[in-house]
């Protein structure tokens, strides 16, 4: 009974053990995921970077120096690539776009740079004795004669090449460029910016004509473009593409009206950072341009006044003919139609309120009037006629009416305080002759009056002055992103690594204690080497940045333009991005690989999604956002894993190196010797068995029965050869059995001898057989060749005979045919000759 109870208990224990083993097997069967590095994944992040410019080489005149310095830009790509991003939704915000700030800074720097080598007009900051230029007609008209006092003839004392001598000169100035010194005396004036700014005269051959500039992203960066036709500049865009450069943007410096820009593809679009905030500017993009033609009809002349060694001041000398006022013409029908479309959009935004357009509320001339550059002169046009209407339900209820053309009176200003900067002013030299220019109005800048929301009227005025809004009207659909080509994701693949395992210890292991320590010390510095590699890269980049700052500080000496600096910066950025990525790939042991497995296990705390949900349902952008908070941790673990791998390899190499001195005494070497010996013995035994079997088969074929391998049997003699006796000295035949031997070495020698003899006989027989076969094949081949040669000769002769027979038959047939033709011709000829004779005979018979 006791034995049966023990057996029952063992049965329960056996079942429990099997169940536990099955559970362990199931748990161990769960697939483990490992971190895999991917290079070149489509992931980007918003960033700010230095953009460089591209421009059409044929877009500028080489005779003059354009203020935009586009000759320093790279040529435009004749086939620009635009890649549409399917199923991508991206956020855009034109009001927080660093591209706008960068363009603003670039344009200001370009203007400043173009003025650096030009003449400073400090000697002209003297008292000017001015009087009004007499006009033949003082009628104030939009397109008639200029108002009295608009142009002043001023005389002043100027020091020329000799410092102690003063000479009196005169020049014509516009009213906007001078201010009275004393209100009591209307004859004493000074230049408008002398008390606040240093006035620099624009160089004579500088042109202000806007040239399209393409902003381009350096390598490692990209520009995203929103292609929604009704995009308001802020929010999500579902039609996104990536480009390397923007479209050509003309840096037109103007206020109130946007000139020569891009048009909306469908309806008019209005954009604002916040429509409820009346302090925010409203940018209007038209869908159809409105032509504006401007002219300065006065025929001006230009003269130069020397104000020092190598310096000249250019001013208006005389005005030939009538002094007529500059003006601009706009089609009233086109303008009213444009306002009607703008009103529709404004009423949608402001709850169908009455829309009122009115003139500017005041400020600097650049704000109050529509200012722009026309042919080198800076026009300031009164835009009251454009913004003087009330719209109720998209119908114009009141406003200035007139003929079909709106004529805007314009004034000209030569001293420009650009960009509202303090301490800097520019004097634009007068342009001789008449000036005409034509532009396209593609947008408006509006401001809304504040007040209580209960009012049913919204008043809008022309705005401007901040050139950033001009650039926003073109850059609203772009944003710069940084490409992040490195991505990590879980996979089932694991990197094969060198494990730290115990070596077999031989006699030389006694010396490996301290010798191996030297290798461990070198391997322990791998962390330090990693840090040094990172610091080295940072030092290179920092050195390049310092060099760029030095070049930028000394660019007036190096004659580098703003675009040249930006191109250098863009190249450095590209190199930096590449080096950074390659540095990480090298630290991780992934150099030159696009897909790199690692030995880092995937932690489900980073993401517990399954492989199918990751690889089949998520984009790289979504996955990057999923693990964004753990990316640095994963990078660190990959780096530590690679460091451990390199340390293991280093220690393994160290052990191999020092163990080689004592390899004859290492147990691994002796195991190798034993393995070779066993292989040799096994081979001999196998050969012995094979040849024994062959010998037995051979003997059986000859009529002998297989006996023991070591039994000596005398060969039987033939009936014609009787056996000899011991006393007789007859000749003995060779026995077929060998002599019995004793000992292992003797047996090996006999076997090897038999093996070599057997191999020799078999190879000889094989060689003889091959020789006979080759001889037979050669003989047969020669006979076949002779047969084919005879056959070829026979058929050649037959063909020759057939050809000769054919030619003979043809010749005979031709000869017979020729004879018949000749006979027919002769008969015809004789008949013709006999015709007169027949006629004569017929006449004779008739007469008889």
Curated annotation (Swiss-Prot):
Region span, Fusion peptide: 504-524
One of its GO biological process terms is: fusion of virus membrane with host endosome membrane
Q: What are the UniProt keywords, alphabetically?
A: AIDS, Apoptosis, Clathrin-mediated endocytosis of virus by host, Cleavage on pair of basic residues, Coiled coil, Disulfide bond, Fusion of virus membrane with host endosomal membrane, Fusion of virus membrane with host membrane, Glycoprotein, Host cell membrane, Host endosome, Host membrane, Host-virus interaction, Lipoprotein, Membrane, Palmitate, Signal, Transmembrane, Transmembrane helix, Viral attachment to host cell, Viral envelope protein, Viral immunoevasion, Viral penetration into host cytoplasm, Virion, Virus endocytosis by host, Virus entry into host cell
The segments labelled V5 in the record are 452-463, 454-463
Which residues point to the Cytoplasmic side?
698-848
Which GO terms label this protein's molecular function in UniProt? structural molecule activity
Q: Cite the residue spans of the region called V2.
A: 154-194
Q: Which residues form a coiled coil?
A: 625-659
Residue ranges crossing the lipid bilayer per the database entry: 677-697
Glycosylation is annotated at 87, 134, 137, 153, 157, 185, 195, 228, 239, 260, 274, 287, 293, 299, 329, 336, 352, 382, 388, 392, 403, 440, 453, 603, 608, 617, 629
Disordered, as annotated region:
714-735
* Location of the region described as V3 in the Swiss-Prot/TrEMBL record: 294-327
Please indicate the ranges of residues that lie on the Extracellular side. Answer: 32-676
**Any one annotated GO CC term:** host cell plasma membrane
Site (Cleavage) residue list: 503-504
Region MPER, annotated ranges? 654-675
Which interval of the chain is the signal sequence? 1-31
UniProt region (CD4-binding loop), positions on chain = 360-370
The misc remark on file is: Inhibitors targeting HIV-1 viral envelope proteins are used as antiretroviral drugs. Attachment of virions to the cell surface via non-specific interactions and CD4 binding can be blocked by inhibitors that include cyanovirin-N, cyclotriazadisulfonamide analogs, PRO 2000, TNX 355 and PRO 542. In addition, BMS 806 can block CD4-induced conformational changes. Env interactions with the coreceptor molecules can be targeted by CCR5 antagonists including SCH-D, maraviroc (UK 427857) and aplaviroc (GW 873140), and the CXCR4 antagonist AMD 070.
The record's comment about this protein's domains reads:
Some of the most genetically diverse regions of the viral genome are present in Env. They are called variable regions 1 through 5 (V1 through V5). Coreceptor usage of gp120 is determined mainly by the primary structure of the third variable region (V3) in the outer domain of gp120. The sequence of V3 determines which coreceptor, CCR5 and/or CXCR4 (corresponding to R5/macrophage, X4/T cell and R5X4/T cell and macrophage tropism), is used to trigger the fusion potential of the Env complex, and hence which cells the virus can infect. Binding to CCR5 involves a region adjacent in addition to V3. The membrane proximal external region (MPER) present in gp41 is a tryptophan-rich region recognized by the antibodies 2F5, Z13, and 4E10. MPER seems to play a role in fusion.
Q: Which family does it belong to?
A: Belongs to the HIV-1 env protein family.
Q: What is this protein called?
A: Envelope glycoprotein gp160
Query: Mind giving the lineage of the organism this protein is from?
Result: Viruses, Riboviria, Pararnavirae, Artverviricota, Revtraviricetes
